[in-house]
């Protein structure tokens, strides 16, 4: 290192050794690497790296926010049913219904016939009917009570509608009707079937659990089939048939009942999601549960609730829309919900899809129930006409006004039901909206594509 490498003032004061003055030292110093300034582009790389890192952090925060943030709860007042909560202090009906179900004696496992009860052998009918005498008495007592307090909070304590013995109860009433008819007690047979449709109406009004509405539709279907079978060969006077026709008509399901019930079912799902935080009365919590559904990754409670809001709004529209009873809206919607994958609320979508599967078929099932009801009312009027006039009417319109105030319309086509005097049958176009001349089945009206009832009167009766 030479003296020239130091500042002048430093070089002057610094002592110089003899070694540094030698020629070898001076030669070595010239070979040392000299300090050079760094290129300017290395500083720009640092800024670029910092910018990319900041963008990465920002993207991570945004994605995390998408997965963790839940939207605020939206408005749902339009879904609230109009039915007010029953304020009666204490009711006993849920307890009585539970006790009644406990008295039902089903067939031994695997021995229940698969055919309708009117096709059973008489000993089988007799054993089943007489073996459930206590249950039938208890059911009559229940039906004699004019008010089941369907809107009372006590119904929320337990899901009685999901009890498997309801199906046995419905078949039991069919068996009672078939057994009495076989004994020649026609009026008793009709009353057993009317009791079944009356039971269906009672269950239809209980909205605490969705299972009650499904049971109501099941009971209504079996009651209609039983009555259609009885009306084939009845000899009951016209005045008595008129009374049964009126009682049956009062128990028919309606669009308005389903619209209101869907609102109650939405509140049921809301309470399952939020528990007491739903804002609903504590004594109406399903099963008395007070727990809120725990939060977890990919499950956003409020976003999931909004899915239920959208779904129930569409179902209510479908229940009231013309030709919506085929259920096409619900099917398309179910497919669109299943197609949502790999999203922040994937678990919530899957939960909503699974829960809604029990509701999507209700408008279509109601459409079939209304079609069966319209066919039965028309068949009642037809049989009354035959009893009095000893002939079939030339058209359904000719049943007005004595036997029908208005000719029932087909709920699927919004047009009159089809009637063929030569074949002696009346039918609905059914879920496929196509008429193919009727499709008699056993049991009656079991073909969803063309529910049909038979008048069972030969062509010679029309001459």
Please place each PLM-identified region on the residue numbering.
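Short acidic linear motifs
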Residues: 2-463
